[in-house]
């Protein structure tokens, strides 16, 4: 079994950037998003996590550039940022992205999200951006309800997958919140993609052995050179040999 790794390409004002704890204004620029995505593809990525931060913060969009990035690569793309109604959902899917993440709308417009899940099925994942057990909305600028109440509702609505981000650790290189991941996977049978805080190769192992976690988004660690994507993929590919079968649920 392997842990699916999704190197991140976050786009703001036409540039690939990384934020610290999701704070607008904390961006560090890493250049052309297309080149970033192609670099991860050349390094062996099978998925890329692509985010339109301007759309997420409600300050515009990079729609044409995002579509160019998706077209430029030959790997699967998970697309996130500002998907809150039929028009933005259809536009996101029209880029050719394999999967889209819905965040704020899952908290503010549950009826629409229920209909979207009915219509699109497992091409939708819901992003659960968490501080403690409180969800964050509108680009992490507003509180959005209690994690486990929302999780139960989304499970009942048929959500196929969750992307769980500890906002306090995102972009900080302080390690993942494994206890948060364990609490979420204990509350749902749906697969979880972990996000936030990965700093070392050992962090990937710690994530992978949580039953129910199928993938991990990696951002700052790759851009800062903490390790390379080929190194991370080698670790992820060896997860099944770790422990006494404790990673048996990974990648389901």
Curated annotation (Swiss-Prot):
<dbReference type="InterPro" id="IPR010188">
    <property type="entry name" value="HisA/PriA_Actinobacteria"/>
</dbReference>
<feature type="active site" description="Proton acceptor">
    <location>
        <position position="10"/>
    </location>
</feature>
<keyword id="KW-0413">Isomerase</keyword>
<dbReference type="InterPro" id="IPR011060">
    <property type="entry name" value="RibuloseP-bd_barrel"/>
</dbReference>
<dbReference type="GO" id="GO:0005737">
    <property type="term" value="C:cytoplasm"/>
</dbReference>
<protein>
    <recommendedName>
        <fullName>1-(5-phosphoribosyl)-5-[(5-phosphoribosylamino)methylideneamino] imidazole-4-carboxamide isomerase</fullName>
        <ecNumber>5.3.1.16</ecNumber>
    </recommendedName>
</protein>
<dbReference type="GO" id="GO:0004640">
    <property type="term" value="F:phosphoribosylanthranilate isomerase activity"/>
</dbReference>
<dbReference type="InterPro" id="IPR006062">
    <property type="entry name" value="His_biosynth"/>
</dbReference>
<comment type="pathway">
    <text>Amino-acid biosynthesis; L-histidine biosynthesis; L-histidine from 5-phospho-alpha-D-ribose 1-diphosphate: step 4/9.</text>
</comment>
<dbReference type="GO" id="GO:0000105">
    <property type="term" value="P:L-histidine biosynthetic process"/>
</dbReference>
<feature type="active site" description="Proton donor">
    <location>
        <position position="129"/>
    </location>
</feature>
<dbReference type="InterPro" id="IPR013785">
    <property type="entry name" value="Aldolase_TIM"/>
</dbReference>
<comment type="similarity">
    <text>Belongs to the HisA/HisF family.</text>
</comment>
<dbReference type="InterPro" id="IPR044524">
    <property type="entry name" value="Isoase_HisA-like"/>
</dbReference>
<dbReference type="GO" id="GO:0003949">
    <property type="term" value="F:1-(5-phosphoribosyl)-5-[(5-phosphoribosylamino)methylideneamino]imidazole-4-carboxamide isomerase activity"/>
</dbReference>
<keyword id="KW-0028">Amino-acid biosynthesis</keyword>
<dbReference type="InterPro" id="IPR023016">
    <property type="entry name" value="Isoase_HisA-like_bact"/>
</dbReference>
<keyword id="KW-0963">Cytoplasm</keyword>
<dbReference type="Pfam" id="PF00977">
    <property type="entry name" value="His_biosynth"/>
</dbReference>
<dbReference type="GO" id="GO:0000162">
    <property type="term" value="P:L-tryptophan biosynthetic process"/>
</dbReference>
<keyword id="KW-0368">Histidine biosynthesis</keyword>
């Amino acid at each position: 079994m392997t842990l699916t790794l999704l190197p991140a390409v976050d786009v703001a004002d036409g540039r690939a950037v990384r934020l610290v704890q999701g704070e607008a204004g904390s961006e560090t620029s890493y250049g052309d998003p297309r080149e970033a995505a192609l670099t991860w593809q050349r390094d062996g990525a099978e998925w890329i996590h692509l985010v339109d931060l301007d759309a997420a913060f409600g300050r515009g969009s990079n729609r044409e550039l995002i579509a160019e990035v998706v077209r430029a690569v030959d790997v699967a793309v998970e697309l996130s940022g500002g998907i809150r109604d039929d028009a933005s959902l259809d536009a996101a899917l029209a880029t050719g992205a394999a999967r889209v993440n819905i965040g704020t709308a899952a908290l503010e417009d549950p009826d629409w999200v229920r209909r979207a899940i009915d219509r699109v099925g497992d091409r939708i994942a819901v992003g659960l951006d968490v501080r403690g057990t409180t969800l964050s909305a509108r680009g992490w600028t507003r509180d959005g309800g209690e994690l486990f109440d929302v999780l139960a509702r989304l499970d009942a609505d048929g959500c196929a997958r969750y992307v769980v981000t500890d906002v306090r650790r995102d972009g900080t290189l302080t390690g993942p919140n494994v206890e948060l991941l364990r609490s979420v996977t204990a509350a749902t049978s749906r697969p979880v993609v972990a996000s936030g805080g990965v700093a070392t190769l050992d962090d990937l192992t710690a994530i992978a052995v949580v039953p129910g976690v199928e993938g991990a988004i990696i951002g700052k660690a790759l851009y800062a050179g903490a390790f390379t994507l080929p190194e991370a993929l080698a670790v992820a590919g060896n997860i099944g040999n770790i422990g006494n079968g404790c990673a048996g649920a990974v990648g389901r």
